[in-house]
Amino acid sequence: MKKIVLLIFLTLNLIALTTNPKIKIPQANRCNIEDNCIDFSRRYSDDEYKRLFGIYKSECELKNLDACIYLAEFYKSGLGVKKDATKSLEILNKTCDENNKFACHNLGVEYQEMKDHKMALEAFKKGCDLAFIQSCFNVAVLYNNGGGVKRDYKKAAKIYKEVCEQNFYEGCYNLAVLYHNTPGVKRDYKEAVKLYKKACDSDFSISCYNLASLYQEQKEYEKANKLYFKACKLDFADACNNLASLYDDALGVEKDDEVAFRYYNKACRLDSASGCKHLAYFYYHGIGTKKDKKLAKEWLKKACKLGLKEACEIVRDFH
């Protein structure tokens, strides 16, 4: 039950914005079965999975709702029992009917994975009604994306605002994106800045990055530099790449090839295709570092593997 939020960003030159926000998925919920709580990030022996499956099954039959949620995950993943997605859904449905907010939320996630957006929306709505903030966020995402319901930015914005006020920073971030640059939504840079800042102040790296991008759009390079630096420190690859470009192109700072090289290097190691391409260029020409054509080719290959077609073409003609 290792669940994470995925926010997809689209890079256009130096600007990146979130498009089609993704469903928020919780970590494995609480466990009240003393000495028998599983860590889904670990790998256990088959015998241990079978033992735990038996415990969760017995506890679920005794109306331990938290155990039922774990049992559903065991059926879904085939841990200690034959994989049975239908049984997993059945257990989550019954547990959700008992007003367990975690079950309702996980039920929504399963329906979403099955591309049944309508049923996902209903499950998330119930989780939200039971005061599970991640479910509320997911309802907003579905309205934002038009999943299971007609796209409605106004409703999405209302819910994002509510969860943001409860310091759920993905909500602040997605609301900022709506105000920043979403087709069909009136731009409000002042509000976008405020919301990006709130999420960034809590180390939500992509929010720091987008705020930096917004400042860069307005040619406020000093502010952009500080925010790219923070996001890069939080290991956000494109922020490292953009920070390098400011030093490379002398935007708001003195040109500094060594600093640019350092940040392109970090960007590439964090899997920024653009960072790898620039790093290769620096090695090829000996900019900010010792010339090394062999390394230049290696980083171009990585940029190609990361999907940068331009890098693939250069590798083919490399000499």
What are these model-derived regions, one by one?
Residues 1-21:
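Classical Sec-dependent N-terminal signal peptides that target proteins to the secretory pathway
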Residues 20-74:
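N-terminal segments that cap or nucleate solenoid repeat domains
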Residues 28, 32-34, 41-44, 61-64, ...:
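Short helix-capping/linker turns of helical repeat alpha-solenoids
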Residues 37-45, 55, 70-77, 91, ...:
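Hydrophobic face of amphipathic alpha-helices that form TPR/SEL1-like repeat modules
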